[in-house]
């Protein structure tokens, strides 16, 4: 399951909370959970996350100059006035819950280096699941908008390599 912006927020909230046992993997794009909607998956699942470093709608980090700073519960206040959980804090919380290796390794793709594209892999998660986070210099959109279609092939390759298996419950 994949979703962009609000669709990615759906994945980070309701899909993780209620559908994790039915999904092999998820691929949220340019999204982060809203404050108060960041449940942990009830069963482990693989995640590939794409986020533009220049996203001013749902910020990747609180350091973007157009953000309004940090909000309650260590959220970032975006220029739209919403409070979003900081992306890497949320992923770290999920990875800790799924007992992933704390250190990341490079996750090579055919886009590496293009516009700063880099992907990091955390493996060793419960049930053999993995978490990948990819980012580059683009905004609130699918990676590189419609100039490149490689983002979807990276997502699809990840999902094909993480089929549904019996998952240990928590």
Task: Describe the residue ranges of each PLM region.
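Primarily recognizes the serine-hydrolase "nucleophile elbow" in alpha/beta-hydrolase
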Residues: 1-46, 56
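Short linear functional motifs in flexible/disordered or boundary regions
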Residues: 38, 59-61, 106, 167
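Conserved strand-to-helix beginnings and helix N-cap segments that scaffold or border functional pockets
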Residues: 40, 60, 145-149
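C-terminal catalytic histidine-bearing segment of alpha/beta-hydrolase fold enzymes
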Residues: 47-50, 81-86, 91-170
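Acidic catalytic loop of the alpha/beta-hydrolase fold
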Residues: 55-58, 140-142
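A solvent-exposed, charged loop/short amphipathic helix patch at secondary-structure junctions
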Residues: 57-82
């Amino acid at each position: 399951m994949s979703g962009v912006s609000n669709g990615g927020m759906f994945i980070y909230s309701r899909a993780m909370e209620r559908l994790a046992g039915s999904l092999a993997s998820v691929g949220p794009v340019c999204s982060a959970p809203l404050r108060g909607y960041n449940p942990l998956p009830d069963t482990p699942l693989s995640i590939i996350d794409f986020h533009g470093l220049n996203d001013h709608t749902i910020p990747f980090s609180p350091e973007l100059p157009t953000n309004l700073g940090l909000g309650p519960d260590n959220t970032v206040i975006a220029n739209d006035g919403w409070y979003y959980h900081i992306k890497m804090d949320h992923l770290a919380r999920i990875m800790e819950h799924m007992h992933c290796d704390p250190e990341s390794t490079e996750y090579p793709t055919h886009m590496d280096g293009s516009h700063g594209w880099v992907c990091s892999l955390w493996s060793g998660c419960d049930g053999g699941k993995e978490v990948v986070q990819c980012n580059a210099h683009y905004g609130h959109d699918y990676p590189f908008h419609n100039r490149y279609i490689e983002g979807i092939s990276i997502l699809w390759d990840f999902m094909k390599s993480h089929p549904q298996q019996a998952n240990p419950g928590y």
